Amino acid sequence: MKAKIVPEKTNLHPRNLHKFGYDFEALTTCSSELKNHVFTNEYDTQTINFSNPEAVKALNNALLIAYYNIKNWGIPQDYLCPPIPGRADYLHYIADLLATTNNQIIPEGENVIGLDIGIGANCIYPIIGNAIYDWSFVGTDIDEKAIQNCKKIIENNPKLIDAISLQQQVESRFIFKNIILTDDKFAFTICNPPFHNSAAEATKSSARKVNNLQEIRTKNPVLNFGGQNTELWCDGGEIGFITQMIYESAKYPMQVLWFTTLVSKRENLSSIYKTLNKVSAVEIKTIDMAQGQKNSRIVAWTFLSELQQKAWRF
């Protein structure tokens, strides 16, 4: 008997290609590897074990083939393997944000350039942004191995070669310095900042995630989405990273239309707003997002007046 495919109630952006959940029957036709991980649960629904990193990688690979025409995608072991629907949501909300300064028309094409802070080894944001909106990207990271893996993904997909450029941040204490150069113009920046304050905190969180998914305890938790140290934690955690980003952004007020970042912890918003006011941000927006049971938000800010925003040319 064929398993039922029940669309999830995801609360994703209306344009999100994944808003009806995962059609595993269709996805397994794209990836034999994924087929090995799909099973029918007690609710007679097809699914995978989301606490298994290899299963999540196989799902991502199938999604990238089926929806974004990306071949030979892969990441090294223990690197962040992000849930694609949530990453796509961020970009759809960025598109809506750009439309507010473009007569409510979403700007598309290679002249819309985004800066991905912390691209990781997966290259997900530029892949999705280019596939859906034909945007161009500069991706940065302090991790040379992550940059090299993104380079491999791009080389495996010739359509990405002219759309995505990569730059390693050689001074890890900086975010925009060395990256935004004198003549650069970016329509937006995106960032999924390190969440935790320390490696110990990251490990504890990973154990909790696995327990929630598997309903078992383990002494050596496997991160269901992986993650290197630089992806998961930094001194000061999320609020420390975002605070530094805000102060640095003030040095490039005319070169970026919208600076943005994900904010996982709602309690950090008050401090973020105070810092943005300190650096005299002209406009601040908070965009709520939801994926299943997980709630997050984007904070966006600009140093451009309304007239300057309207005059921006993509």
Curated annotation (Swiss-Prot):
InterPro entries associated with the record: METTL16/RlmF, rRNA_lsu_MeTfrase_F, SAM-dependent_MTases_sf
Alphabetically ordered keywords of this record: Cytoplasm, Methyltransferase, rRNA processing, S-adenosyl-L-methionine, Transferase
Keyword rRNA processing included in the entry's annotation: yes
Gene Ontology MF term list: 23S rRNA (adenine(1618)-N(6))-methyltransferase activity
Subcellular localization: Cytoplasm
Catalyzed reactions per annotation: adenosine(1618) in 23S rRNA + S-adenosyl-L-methionine = N(6)-methyladenosine(1618) in 23S rRNA + S-adenosyl-L-homocysteine + H(+)
Documented EC number(s): 2.1.1.181
Gene3D superfamilies the UniProt entry points to: Vaccinia Virus protein VP39
Listed Pfam families: Methyltransf_10
Cellular component GO terms, alphabetical: cytoplasm
Keyword check for rRNA processing: yes
UniProt main location, coarse: cytoplasm
Biological-process GO terms, alphabetical: rRNA base methylation
Top class in the EC scheme: transferase
Family designation: Belongs to the methyltransferase superfamily. METTL16/RlmF family.
Function of the molecule: Specifically methylates the adenine in position 1618 of 23S rRNA.
UniProt cross-references to HAMAP family, sorted A to Z: 23SrRNA_methyltr_F
Protein name listed in UniProt: Ribosomal RNA large subunit methyltransferase F
